[in-house]
Amino acid sequence: MVAPGLVLGLVLPLILWADRSAGIGFRFASYINNDMVLQKEPAGAVIWGFGTPGATVTVTLRQGRETIMKKVTSVKAHSDTWMVVLDPMKPGGPFEVMAQQTLEKINFTLRVHDVLFGDVWLCSGQSNMQMTVLQIFNATRELSNTAAYQSVRILSVSPTQAEQELEDLVAVDLQWSKPTSENLGHGYFKYMSAVCWLFGRHLYDTLQYPIGLIASSWGGTPIEAWSSGRSLKACGVPKQGSVPYDSVTGPSKHSVLWNAMIHPLCNMTLKGVVWYQGESNINYNTDLYNCTFPALIEDWRETFHRGSQGQTERFFPFGLVQLSSDLSKKSSDDGFPQIRWHQTADFGYVPNPKMPNTFMAVAMDLCDRDSPFGSIHPRDKQTVAYRLHLGARALAYGEKNLTFEGPLPEKIELLAHKGLLNLTYYQQIQVQKKDNKIFEISCCSDRRCKWLPASMSTVSTQSLTLAIDSCRGTVVALRYAWTTWPCEYKQCPLYHPSSALPAPPFIAFITDQDPGHQSNVAK
C-alpha cells in the first residue's frame, strides 16, 4: 500500500482562527473553524476548546443579528478545557459561533463563521480510502462538479502518530472547506478522500441538507494501528511482532493512529463512520480480524458516545467497504477471501449479531488490472460510494423497500443421491454469466478434504442448482468467490437484478460434520 509523506506544518492557523484579542491559551478545538458542519437534530452539537482554568466561557450561536442560543460553562482546572452542548438544531445555516472567555472582568473572544448544521460523517482506513478524486476514473469531470455541492463541507486530518491518546489534533491537511477542484484533487493519496467525497455527495443528493465529511486515513496501515489498546487486548492480539513489509508500509505500531488521528475527534457529535481498510491485514493477524474489526467498531462507538456527552448515538451507523482484489497476489492465496469474510465477523453479511447497525459495499467485482497505482488501488470509487450510500440510506436513515445488499442463499440443500446441491436465495438473483469455478465444494474422503469446482446446473429467479457429482466422497462445505480475484470488472456471475449489487462471497458448512456452522448463510 502507498504510504504518503507525513504532512505537518499546519499548526499556525490554530492561533490565527481566533480574534487578535484572544488570550494566550484560549482557543477552539483544532477542527472548529469557518465553514464547518455541526451535527443536526436530534443530537446536540458539541463545541469545545481550551482556556484559562477558572474562567467562564459563554458560547453564543447567532444567525445574522439574531441570537439563537447561549450556553455558559467554565474551564476545567485539570485539563484546561471547556465544553458546551448546543440545543438540537434543524439542518441549515449559515450561523456564527462565538465563544467568550471571562476572567476577572477581562474578556477574550473567538468567532467562526459560515457554520452549517447537517450530518457529519467520519471516513477512515488505509490508501483506498486515501485516494483522491484526481486518481479515479473520470477525474476531470468529477473535479468540475463542485459548484452544486457547496453545502457539502470537507476536512482532512494530517497523517500523525502518537504514543498516547491525544485530546486534540496535532495538525490538519485541510481545514473545514467548501469543495473545489483544487482541494479535492490535491495530489495523490493526500487531502480529501474520493470515496468519502462521493459518498457525501450521494447523501446530499438524497437528503438535500448539509453534509460534513472528515477524512482521517493513512495508506499501508493495519487495523491494529487504528485500534485502542483496550480493543486489542479484548481480542488477545499479541504484542508487537514482525510485520510483513509487502503489505504493511505505513505505521504498524499498535494504537498510534487511534491515539493521534481518531481519539482527538471523539468529543465531536457524529452521524456515522465509513471504513475502508483490510489490505494490510491479509498476512498480518489475519485470523484475528473477525475479532479486531468488530472490537474496533464497538470501541469507537463507545468512545465517541462518551466523548460527545452522549450526543453521538451509542450504536451509530458504521459502513465498510469489503476488499476488492489485487493482481499481484496468487489466486490461491487465502488472505483476501479470509479478510472479506472476517470483515463480516464470519457471517457473510451485515448487519449481524456481532456487528449491529452496520452496512457494507461489496467491491470484489471492481477490479482494475491497469490502475497506474497498482491493481490493489482500483479507480472506480464511484461505484464503491454508490453502494455505500445505499446501505446508509437503509440503515442510517431508515429508508424502506430499498435494496442495499446483494443476494445470499438462505437455504442450502444437499441432494447427494442426485449429485446436486440446491441453493435458495431470499432475494431475486440474476446470473450474468455462468462460471463453473466460482462455486466450490469441500469433498472429503478417507479423512482428507479438498476443494473442487461445482458447476452451475439450473437457475431460476430465486434458486440455483450446482452439480456436485465430481465428489466421490462426502460434501461438507460450499464456498462462493473464495479467491483474491473472483471475476473481471462487474462480471461476477451473480447479481441482484434491479440494483446490480453483486452477491457477496461466503463459506457455509452443509452437513453436521462441522457443528460450528449451519448451512443457512443469510439472515
Curated annotation (Swiss-Prot):
Catalytic activity: N-acetyl-9-O-acetylneuraminate + H2O = N-acetylneuraminate + acetate + H(+); an Ac-O-9-sialoglycoconjugate + H2O = a sialoglycoconjugate + acetate + H(+)
EC number from the UniProt entry: 3.1.1.53
Keyword Amino-acid biosynthesis appears in the UniProt entry: no
Predominant place of localization: other
InterPro entries documented for this protein: SASA, SGNH_hydro_sf, SIAE
Signal peptide extent: 1-23
GO MF term list: sialate 9-O-acetylesterase activity
Gene3D superfamilies: SGNH hydrolase (3.40.50.1110)
Entry keyword Methyltransferase: no
Top-level EC class as recorded in UniProt: hydrolase
One GO term (biological process): carbohydrate metabolic process
GO cellular component, one term: lysosome
Keywords carried by this UniProt record: Glycoprotein, Hydrolase, Lysosome, Serine esterase, Signal
Organism domain of life: Eukaryota
Subcellular location: Lysosome
Glycosylation sites: N107, N138, N267, N290, N401, N422
Function per UniProt: Catalyzes the removal of O-acetyl ester groups from position 9 of the free diacetylated sialate N-acetyl-9-O-acetylneuraminate (Neu5,9Ac2) in the cytosol and of the diacetylated sialate residues of sialylglycoconjugates in the lysosomes. Together with the sialate-O-acetyltransferase they regulate the balance of acetylated sialoglycoconjugates, key players in various processes such as cell-cell interactions, host-pathogen recognition, and tumor antigenicity.
Protein's UniProt name: Sialate O-acetylesterase
The organism of origin for this protein: Pongo abelii
Lineage of the organism: Eukaryota, Metazoa, Chordata, Craniata, Vertebrata
